[in-house]
Amino acid sequence: MQKLLLLTIFLFIFKTGTSQVTFTDSNLPIVVITTNSQTIIDSAKITCDMGIISNGIGMRNYMTDPFNNFVGQIGIEIRGSTSQQYPKKSYGFETRTPAGIALDVPLLGMPAENDWILYGAYPDKSLMRNEITYHLFSSMDPYSPRYVYCELVIDGQYMGVYSLLERVKIDHNRVNIAKLDSNDLAGDSLTGGYIIKIDKPTGSSSTSWTSPYQVKVKFLFHDPKDYEILPQQAQYIQDYVTAFEDTVYGPNFSDTAGGGGFRRYINTGTFIDFFLMEELGRTVDGYRSSSFMYKDKDSKGGKLSCGPMWDFNLSYGNADYCLAYDTTGWQYNFATVCPSFTSEPPHWWARLLQDTIYTHDLKCRWNDLRQNILSTNNVNAWIDSVALRLNESQQRNFTEWPILGVYVNWNWFVGNTYQEEVDYLKWWFKSRSEWMDANLPGTCPMVTVAVPENETEKTTVLVYPNPFSTAATFSFNHADNSEKTLVIYDLLGKEVVLKNIAGGENKTVIEKNGVNAGMYFYHLKKKGRTIASGKLVIE
């Protein structure tokens, strides 16, 4: 197999076929696939050989270099739905043993697994709309797909700039929840784990179920797959989601006092982060396609969670229909803008905004994110850094695929240069963020705190897990061994927890104990002076 791959390189250097690019080296890793005279199709994986050249950050990678990151067999197929119309294809592949068995391997520094994607951006001429979403969300929630930019060669043909990307699935290093097996048919074992998604069914009707409240909302089984999940398991997760819908559309949907409201079923923190990212990107397919949800076992806090984010190539002003290009307005109202579409966002997104605690938490989370992760300066710096890294490879990509200055379904903006595409992305993000600053519902009163008289008294507190549903641990190490006070305030500045704790190195557990779900502020104090503070989310 190594010889076959080396032969592919030799043929590529001396005969580029129909490629417009003579490709010899790159600052990005190089992925080389040999199909052995087969055709990659979308209905079944074919067995091919693959090698990866990656000499490390700051080092150049040459087509004549040995495969030093991976060399072996894969099963590969074309992936995507509407994206299959584009000449630059994306691929799903599985790393395998010579016997054809799935083989977990680490690729380009990402944790070992066997399910991968080679994503080739086409209508997204910035080459980074998916990637910026995954990058930002990785700092917000437990898991977001990892990726590494690379350049792809198939059978001697230069294919362009790609992202080698993790496929969403249940795994310790991906969506880290329990994995169902055939014995998990009752009790706690039946309650998780599940990954489902709201999407367009691509197979038979058995692959999905329809919301009893909206015929245009389809839920698909993702992991376990539709052909793996057992009837009892499929019925359980369907009943759970329906119970959530029954509650959220019911008359007492908030019911924070009685504990019977929607918070009984969902991790509100993940719903908030999902909502903010969907609205920030204003993805034209937002909420109604490629929208993942997952649930762990009840014994592990198994409420329904939203995420990870997926499929943002037609986001951030990159679609010319249904007002997706407009930096004003809400994407969750898609059905009122384009009522004729066969799919629509679940109405629960609008319903949740009728809960004042939820909108308080939403506003506070947004304000916090805009100070760091989602600040315009932070996002612009990331975009500029990626554009710089891709400066060389994007030229080859757009030589092979000469679409700069050309309309591709469904571009709203058509830049004549790569830099114009990058600048438009930055402008759109800034404009959209500022509109959300002014129009996001909810209020977030700030708690006034004293500034430490001696700045050297400040310390760092680690809170985990955060958000939490039963208890959280506050860990810190302060040089002064005197007694400290931990105070937790609600959004109106009212004390809900006050606990005296020892100084020095300390780990203190705070239990929920009837405190309502929502966002709170904690302050670690010494003699009345705040030496550390932060935000806390209780589910």
Q: What positions do the PLM features span?
A:
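Sec/Tat signal peptide C-region and signal peptidase I cleavage site
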Residues: 15-19
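Phosphate-handling architecture centered on phosphoinositide signaling
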Residues: 20-274, 327, 379, 403, ...
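Middle-to-C-terminal accessory/interaction subdomains
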Residues: 27-29, 38-41, 46, 80-82, ...
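C-terminal outer-membrane/trafficking sorting elements
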Residues: 5, 455-464, 468-539
